[in-house]
């Protein structure tokens, strides 16, 4: 009898040792699961393609090296628990109740939570790798476009900065048409430069690791674009002004031709030696009304010409010179008309 009791006591002691081991092992495993579940829930990935690929390698070390031995521990805990249960049943002892939170169902639930977080992290890492790959592709395309835009801008700035550009005064109309064609070509590209601004914003929003370089090169191009538009506007204004001044010069010439034509009429033998004084007076009245109209035209031309007085250059010099000559010839014509009337009225 004593031998049998000793055997039972020994068995119970072994079971108690197993229970203690279960408590220790389950506590350690649950602690590891809690730490790893928290780690799996974090999304503090590196902000570059290479960095996030290394993050993924680190994650795979967890999945394929660190986790499998713990999965084995998890299985062994289940085996130990059922062994204890069987032995207690054999000895007709009450069932084993692990401490609160350390039951098989608790461990199972914690393990499932860990695997769920692991799956979510795996998906998130793969998505982040794809996002970083896309950003790298877009950055390469952006830099290629920056190169093209820079080439175009440098070329056009060179063209518009040339001192000979639009300076063909013998044919301002041709220069203006050429400028309009160049202007249309430049302005048709405006959306390409708006797109650069949009892309810069995109890289900023996506927190691309190279956004600083993108911003610097993008701003460089946009600054050149602004400079090109300023040059374009400056030439546009100058050519418009040249066109206006040439039209004004043509108006002066037209009035001047009228003065010369009238001068010729006064000098003509037909007028000077007219037999019929009445007929000559009629012609003189007509000429005088024309002279009055010329006087009004000169006033108008001088008033319009004031806007060009501050402009430097050969066209404005010609305007001043031609107006002076026109006034001089007009005074002479007026004097001839006055003398002629006095002669006729004697």
Model-predicted segments: where are they?
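Extended alpha-helical coiled-coil rod segments
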Residues: 1-346
